[in-house]
Amino acid sequence: MHLNIALWACGALLAVLLAWQQRKCWRLIWQLNGWRGVIQQPVLWLLLCINLHPNSILEKVSQYRVHFQRPLAVLVGTRVLLYIDDPAGMECVLNAPECLDKTFLQDGFFVRRGLLHARGQKWKLRRKQLNPAFSHNIVASFFDVFNSVGNQMVEQFQTQTNLHGQAVKFTAAEDLLSRAVLEVSCLTIMGTPTNFTQLDDAHIAHSYKRLLEISAVRVVKPWLQIRLLHRLLAPELYEESKKCAKLLEDFVGGIVRTKHRNWRLRDAVGGEKSGEDASNGWQRRIFIEQIFQLAANGEMTLEEIMDEAQSMVLVSFETVSNSIMLALLCLATNKGDCQRRLLAEIRALVPDVGQVGLEQLQQLRYLDAFVSESLRLLATVPMNLRHVSRDFRLAGRQHETIVPQNSIVVLDTFNMQRDERWWGANARQFDPQRFLDQEEEQLSKGHNDSGSGEKRRQRDRRHSYSFLPFSNGLRSCIGRRYGLFIMKVFLVKLITNFDFQSDFELEKLQFVENISLKFKNADDILLTIQPKKEST
């Protein structure tokens, strides 16, 4: 009898303590959605549990989100998972000092050290140290590298006879392109030629991609971040991740140690710390040469340099190569005059596509619109997660809304950029015209017909944060210019030399959240790549 009373008392005490810990979470749920938000919690828990896998989570979120009032708060233990898919909410979170850090979920990421996942003051310091390495002038100085590797990539496409006029899998073209982008990353980040454009017999590119896929699983299933549980619950995945990680650590570590040793030797004999002779002048500007100086000043260790190099190579290679492939997919499936207009503009403004210059890129307005539209429709990084370091007010709400400390904010860029509320009735259609300045100027003058009036209303309600290809706010992408320049240079060369066609329909894509956007049915996507008879 006494034992039962004691057990009941302990249970009641634990319930009270749990309720006290959750009080701010329930308050947020109430402030956002009232009783409806409270009643929906069991349904949300169930949906979250049964769809907890990268292969399904993005597709299911896209499917279910319209049935709930958003922003949406889900209670998870003593934390809140706050889902946001509107521009005002994005702006508030991305500019809030309380939301600067990544979440513990992202500790499952393969590269969890370095700028990519640094937190608090460490991130602020490291970002300040690394900003000069990605300045406009520095990135613009890499155009000779972009062009050289881009030309090699075109040669590889031309010599791959199995690609010419035949329907090939999307993944086959992706492999060739991703190796070329990895070559650029290794040259501009670490100053080391790797010849990946021709051959990657060590499977470095594949290992990077595979580790990202495994990282995505560890993010949505955080218990796999514990090594013992990962080894017990997913032994094959654990062994594969261990093997790939070792391969990439040896690859990057070997390059960094060799480059650092040579850098110190040059310094010892009185040579330039930054570099090489004039014939290899671009090497004086590479990322790793600049951060070696930070190490010499005692601001970084060699291990931290390796972390930063690994992080930068991975992010620059994966996001850029994926962005280019997504753009080519949009191009190939477009049945309008997009490809013709791009080719006409390039031939009119770029006399020699073998040496594309920055000034020429800046004149390619339709290419800009095409790139922006592909990044809008198929967001390279579909979702962004932020940790709330202390309570903060979610602005833009009619009533006061306080997001409690330790909440996890999910920023759904993918669905926001395809939402009819911000992009109109054709939000899920590929239409580069929407980004053209000329179209905006025509809309601003105003027309009396209903069509232009509807477009004008779309423009007026479009928030500046409704398009976030490289994030924004306090923690925006440090390599935005770098990524855009590579993407545009490569696209100019590919569009000028090849025709891309596909009978696949974008509406049939099955989306996968693998850190960057992937497709469950990628093997069903067939591309026809035909060399042009008259290449510029």
UniProtKB/Swiss-Prot annotation:
Protein name (record): Probable cytochrome P450 318a1
Residues passing through the membrane, by range: none
Entry-linked InterPro entries: Cyt_P450, Cyt_P450_CS, Cyt_P450_E_grp-IV, Cyt_P450_sf, Cytochrome_P450_Monoox
Cofactor: heme
Recorded family membership: Belongs to the cytochrome P450 family.
Pfam families noted in UniProt: p450
Record organism: Drosophila melanogaster
Protein's membrane topology: Peripheral membrane protein
Localization per Swiss-Prot or TrEMBL: Endoplasmic reticulum membrane; Microsome membrane
Segments of this protein annotated with the region Disordered: 439-460
Function: May be involved in the metabolism of insect hormones and in the breakdown of synthetic insecticides.
GO CC list: endoplasmic reticulum membrane
Record-linked PANTHER family: CYTOCHROME P450 4C3-RELATED, CYTOCHROME P450 FAMILY 4
Enzyme class per UniProt: oxidoreductase
Record carries keyword Lipoprotein: no
Binding-site list for heme: C477
EC id: 1.14.-.-
Entry's Gene Ontology molecular function annotations: heme binding; iron ion binding; monooxygenase activity; oxidoreductase activity, acting on paired donors, with incorporation or reduction of molecular oxygen
Compositional bias ranges of the Basic and acidic residues kind: 439-457
Top-rank taxon: Eukaryota
Keywords: Endoplasmic reticulum, Heme, Iron, Membrane, Metal-binding, Microsome, Monooxygenase, Oxidoreductase
